[in-house]
């Protein structure tokens, strides 16, 4: 494999300082070298264990330290999770992501998590999980169960990180990513824009991600969703152009990674989302609520796809078929139908 040069902070800062139109042009050129610009990967995310998290992430309504009105729930039954996965597949998703509000999974829960992964894979969906810190053995067990992706975000730069989280170190996050990679699972890791960070911090986050031994296959870029009761509830809104700029820099720095629009898409108008796709975003969460924050309704997503001429990307998975792909493509190319949206809203 050819040596991949490491990025420097000054190089990344220069990208952020480029005139926006020049930056978008460069990002779109890079994007077209590695991806079909009309294809977007579609995922659904389910919270399989909600609330009562012992961590103190200042942005998160799931932390037990903040009064956000979120009711804590135990780990969902395996069949409940698989039923949600079936609905996600019927609605057109090709990847099903399962998130649990834990510092780390308990050993007693591992057999259930393995069954969830196996069940999702048996449907022909890609399986992704985000469960907090993992041990080497836990990462290997999930890999053996067939897990495709593991999400563990770095959130922000190492320098700003201590202002947001104190219950888990930055190095712990990097260690988990290494364990996931060593187990043979693809890495999903990104961060959040709007925490109160500077442009230098955004550059520092992307620098960490791009300079990993192997960059993440998937890079979610979140816009802070301000939740009443969390310490960041009164943060300033993120300027749309600043967010688009972050997407473009991520695309240039990690040309073969999927750059995903994740939390915060509900706050974006169609024009902002469209410019994010121009900047190189090529993955979204579709439909179901994004953990505990709103996600645009399916029909709005489909309408936007039609307006922009975008298509959901087909995903080759074991034991799968393309039924969900055909459903979604049909919905994208034809007017809304009761049959499709009843299926999507089940």
Curated annotation (Swiss-Prot):
GO molecular function: 2 iron, 2 sulfur cluster binding; 4 iron, 4 sulfur cluster binding; biotin synthase activity; iron ion binding
Cofactor(s) this protein cannot do without: [4Fe-4S] cluster; [2Fe-2S] cluster
Residues involved in [2Fe-2S] cluster binding: 97, 128, 188, 260
Catalyzed reactions: (4R,5S)-dethiobiotin + (sulfur carrier)-SH + 2 reduced [2Fe-2S]-[ferredoxin] + 2 S-adenosyl-L-methionine = (sulfur carrier)-H + biotin + 2 5'-deoxyadenosine + 2 L-methionine + 2 oxidized [2Fe-2S]-[ferredoxin]
Short name of one Pfam family: BATS
UniProt entry keywords in alphabetical sequence: 2Fe-2S, 4Fe-4S, Biotin biosynthesis, Iron, Iron-sulfur, Metal-binding, S-adenosyl-L-methionine, Transferase
Pathway: Cofactor biosynthesis; biotin biosynthesis; biotin from 7,8-diaminononanoate: step 2/2
EC number: 2.8.1.6
Claim: Endoplasmic reticulum is one of the keywords in the record: no
Ranges of residues in domain Radical SAM core: 38-256
Record: residues binding [4Fe-4S] cluster: 53, 57, 60
Free-text cofactor note: Binds 1 [4Fe-4S] cluster. The cluster is coordinated with 3 cysteines and an exchangeable S-adenosyl-L-methionine.
GO biological processes: biotin biosynthetic process
HAMAP family associated with the record: BioB (MF_01694)
The protein's assembly and partners: Homodimer.
Role description: Catalyzes the conversion of dethiobiotin (DTB) to biotin by the insertion of a sulfur atom into dethiobiotin via a radical-based mechanism.
PANTHER family, A to Z: BIOTIN SYNTHASE, BIOTIN SYNTHASE, MITOCHONDRIAL
Family: Belongs to the radical SAM superfamily. Biotin synthase family.
Protein name, UniProt field: Biotin synthase
Species for this entry: Shigella dysenteriae serotype 1 (strain Sd197)
């Amino acid at each position: 494999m050819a040596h991949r040069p490491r990025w420097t902070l000054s190089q990344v800062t220069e990208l952020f300082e480029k005139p926006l139109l020049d930056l978008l042009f460069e990002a779109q050129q890079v994007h077209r070298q590695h991806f079909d610009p009309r294809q977007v990967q579609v995922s659904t995310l389910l919270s399989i264990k909600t609330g009562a998290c012992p961590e103190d992430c200042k942005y998160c309504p799931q932390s037990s330290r903040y009064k956000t009105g979120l009711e804590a729930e135990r780990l969902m039954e395996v069949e409940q999770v698989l039923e949600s996965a079936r609905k996600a597949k019927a609605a057109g998703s090709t990847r099903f992501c399962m998130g649990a509000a834990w510092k780390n999974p308990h050993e007693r829960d591992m057999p259930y998590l393995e069954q969830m992964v196996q069940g999702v894979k048996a449907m022909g969906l890609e399986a992704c999980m985000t469960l907090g810190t993992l041990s080497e053995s836990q990462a290997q067990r999930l890999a053996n169960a067939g897990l495709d992706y593991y999400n563990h975000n770095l959130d922000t730069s190492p320098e700003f990180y201590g202002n947001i989280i104190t219950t888990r170190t930055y190095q712990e996050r990097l260690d988990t990513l290494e364990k996931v990679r060593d187990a043979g699972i693809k890495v999903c890791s990104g961060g959040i824009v709007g925490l109160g960070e500077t442009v230098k911090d955004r550059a520092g986050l992307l620098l960490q991600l791009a300079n990993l031994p192997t960059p993440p296959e998937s890079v979610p870029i979140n816009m802070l969703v301000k939740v009443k009761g969390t310490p960041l509830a009164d943060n300033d809104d993120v300027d749309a152009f600043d967010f688009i700029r972050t997407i473009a820099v991520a695309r240039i720095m990690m040309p073969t990674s999927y750059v995903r629009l994740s939390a915060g898409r509900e706050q974006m108008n169609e024009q902002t989302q469209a410019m994010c796709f121009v900047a190189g975003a090529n993955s979204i969460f579709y439909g179901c609520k994004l953990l505990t924050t709103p996600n645009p309704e399916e029909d709005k997503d489909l309408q936007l796809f039609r307006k922009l001429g975008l298509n959901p990307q087909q995903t080759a998975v074991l034991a799968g078929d393309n039924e969900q792909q055909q459903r979604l493509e049909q919905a994208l190319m034809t007017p809304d139908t009761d049959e499709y949206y009843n299926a999507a809203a089940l």
